[in-house]
Amino acid sequence: MEQATRSYFDKRGEILVKNLQKRHFEAYYCATKEEALKQVLELIPEGSTVGWGGAVSAAQVGVQAAVHAGNYTVIDRDQFSDPAEKLRCMRECFNADYFITGANSLSIDGQMVNIDGNGNRVGMIVYGPKNIIVVAGMNKVCPSVEDAVKRARTIAAPMNQQRFGLPNPCSCTGVCGNCLNETSICNQILITRNCKPAGRIKFVLVGEELGF
């Protein structure tokens, strides 16, 4: 990464951490993926029950692999091919001690935006697991919450759609078609503007480009 980009991310990271803390989130800034992995593992006591959704950024940091290798009870839907077992795992995550997720976007004033297909990820952010850990690269940070919603819909969702390959317009065009398909991955949009109870949601911001 160029030094100018690193310096830019570092400066914005410092501002964002302060703004997240004003909104009662726990927040940490890590310059590298290696630092971020260490920080995430420091937040999760051994013996905890840990689950996650489709957390690409966390996977790029190495969180899921480290949790599998550690002394934790793991809830991982990707271990199953049977849809019923996958659904069971998704529901089981509501009782996890820690749920690991990413963010589709963040506003520099400390608000998080997520867009979801099934609703399990946004549902758990709102209510369920005792602790939420959000791993997010600084490429996700936008000037305003309006820009963050726009990013979630027009960048994050179409890019995620390329992973899933579902028969939605953005699969073919790369552009949001504002579809209402049964296969849409954009059925719920969640703005998390404050944390209650304080500290339940913990951000580990990474000074690199991660996820979509």
Regions found by a protein language model. Give the residues of each.
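N-terminal start-of-chain detector that recognizes signal peptides
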Residues: M1-E2, Q21-H24, N71-V74, E85-L87, ...
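Glycine- and acidic-residue-enriched helix-capping/strand-helix junction motifs
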Residues: M1-F9
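Short, flexible active-site loop motifs that bind/organize anionic cofactors or intermediates
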Residues: Q3, F25-A27, M138
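N-terminal active-site beta-alpha-beta segment that forms phosphate/nucleotide-binding
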Residues: F9, G13-M90, N95-F99
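Conserved phosphate- and dinucleotide-binding cores of soluble alpha/beta proteins
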Residues: F94-F212
